[in-house]
Amino acid sequence: MLKPLGDRIVIELIQTEEKTASGIVLPDTAKEKPQEGKVVAVGSGRVLDNGERVAPEVSVGDRIIFSKYAGTEVKYDGKEYLILRESDILAVIG
């Protein structure tokens, strides 16, 4: 399993089927980048200047919304993941 370092978070992208207002399903090439994902691994947290470690605010299993062009896409064990910094997370859903 991927183990993120520091304030990094590993997420699995949640793909949504995109349709136009008239019901046409858009091909992958015309879709927006997904901005929603499920947290699958969390780093140990960010280290402050005084050496204190701040625990991440998200947990494994959380559904999140993140910045549109954030993170680095990686493939591991046949699945696609995104590794991003905690600061790229905009909200936790639910």
Swiss-Prot record:
Together with the chaperonin GroEL, plays an essential role in assisting protein folding. The GroEL-GroES system forms a nano-cage that allows encapsulation of the non-native substrate proteins and provides a physical environment optimized to promote and accelerate protein folding. GroES binds to the apical surface of the GroEL ring, thereby capping the opening of the GroEL channel. It is found in: Cytoplasm. HAMAP family: CH10. It holds the Pfam family Cpn10. GO terms for biological process: chaperone cofactor-dependent protein refolding. It comes from Anoxybacillus flavithermus (strain DSM 21510 / WK1). This is Co-chaperonin GroES. InterPro entries: Chaperonin_GroES (IPR020818), Chaperonin_GroES_sf (IPR037124), Chaprnonin_Cpn10_CS (IPR018369), GroES-like_sf (IPR011032). GO terms for molecular function: ATP binding; metal ion binding; protein folding chaperone; protein-folding chaperone binding; unfolded protein binding. Heptamer of 7 subunits arranged in a ring. Interacts with the chaperonin GroEL. GO terms for cellular component: cytoplasm. Gene3D superfamilies: GroES chaperonin. PANTHER family: 10 KDA HEAT SHOCK PROTEIN, CO-CHAPERONIN GROES. Belongs to the GroES chaperonin family. Keywords: Chaperone, Cytoplasm. It comes from the Bacteria.
